[in-house]
Amino acid sequence: MFKDKNKIIKSVEKINKLEEGLSLFEEGDEEYLSVLVKIQGLYDEISDTALECFKEMTTKIRKTGQKRIIKGIDQLPHTIKENIADQVNDFKGGAI
């Protein structure tokens, strides 16, 4: 994930440099259009990378949530047993 973050940062830095270079050309120049296409390609790379990161994070969140649910289910019998034991003790204490 950090590799992807660095990739996005490098792409943004390249975009900044290319945008600075745009001032060297007139809007109608072929070079101007070429630079715009390169910038668009970098934005496309950023969006692809961001989507992959989003998918990774979604998977991690899902796995973490599943682990918490499983842990809760595993603890449920113990919790029920404790609650029943407490209630039985309360009944015994009240019956005496």
Curated annotation (Swiss-Prot):
Superkingdom, natural source: Bacteria
The protein's name in its UniProt record: SPbeta prophage-derived uncharacterized protein YosV
